[in-house]
């Protein structure tokens, strides 16, 4: 009779059976995740496509709405815009329709993101994740609103003040439809991204990467960084850069307040758990 001796696994876990392949075992869950991702992307793209059709149908009306800051800066008088290439206005409307469609379909996109991420989160994490999706959209809308109602009218007022009307020379602004759209879209995207700062800081605080005191100590460097980023994201004029940087600095201060709140919540939760009897 032969005796087969086995060496115990020092980790305390059973050895995998012969022929076991960890890569093969993980393939099925990975494929399931990829299938789920594909499905969510399809739903999101369908939402964008439907929004694109709707927005392209009303592209001229949407463009007229975006021209309002220009009209206001021109003292309410009718403005004349030009296009110098036959298909230019068509391509401008296509670009505008896609831009507006993403806005219109954002609730669908956010819902699909949540559906994809939620299965990997605990219940309390899912409850904490949803407000961030809503806050992201609302802060982007806030940034777009600041551009539309404050920044863009003042910027256009400044540029129109550079026109020259004299007996010898007439220099006046004749904005191209494509360039005006690119200008206002750049501002909206730039402000929308910069206005996400409180959300980003709060998420970093929840993950334990930053604290309120760290943000206070880093404030002077943050102001320099915000100014530099605003110079990159905003159009190349000082007024736009300042108009983007100042609200973002205020949002940085709001982010500090939010991070302090997160830290207080964490401390209160830890104290409550410490007071609970063991077992």
Report the location of each language-model feature.
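Membrane topogenic/interface segments and analogous intrinsically disordered interaction regions
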Residues: 1-279
């Amino acid at each position: 009779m032969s005796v087969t001796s086995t060496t115990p696994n020092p980790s305390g876990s059973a050895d995998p059976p012969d022929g076991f392949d960890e890569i093969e075992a993980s393939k099925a869950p990975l494929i399931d995740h990829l299938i789920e991702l594909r499905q969510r992307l399809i739903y999101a793209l369908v939402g964008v496509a439907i929004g694109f059709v709707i927005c392209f149908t009303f592209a001229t009306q949407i463009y007229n709405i975006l021209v309002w800051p220009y009209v206001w800066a021109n003292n309410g008088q009718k403005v004349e815009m030009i296009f110098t290439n036959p298909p230019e206005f068509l391509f401008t409307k296509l670009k505008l329709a896609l831009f507006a469609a993403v806005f219109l379909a954002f609730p669908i996109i956010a819902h699909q993101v949540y559906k994809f991420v939620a299965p990997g989160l605990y219940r309390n994490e899912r409850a904490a994740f949803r407000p961030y999706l809503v806050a992201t959209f609302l802060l982007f809308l806030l940034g777009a609103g600041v551009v539309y109602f404050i920044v863009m009218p003042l910027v256009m007022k400044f540029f129109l003040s550079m026109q020259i009307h004299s007996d010898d020379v007439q220099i006046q602004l004749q904005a191209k439809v494509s360039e005006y759209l690119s200008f206002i879209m750049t501002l909206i995207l730039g402000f929308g991204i910069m206005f996400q700062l409180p959300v980003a800081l709060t998420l970093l605080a929840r993950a334990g990467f930053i604290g309120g005191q760290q943000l206070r100590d880093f404030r002077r460097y943050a102001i320099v960084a915000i100014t530099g980023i605003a110079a990159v994201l905003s159009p190349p004029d000082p007024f736009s850069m300042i108009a983007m940087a100042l609200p973002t600095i205020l949002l940085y201060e709001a982010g500090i307040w939010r991070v302090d709140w997160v830290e207080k919540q964490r401390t209160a939760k830890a104290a409550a758990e410490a007071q609970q009897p063991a077992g």
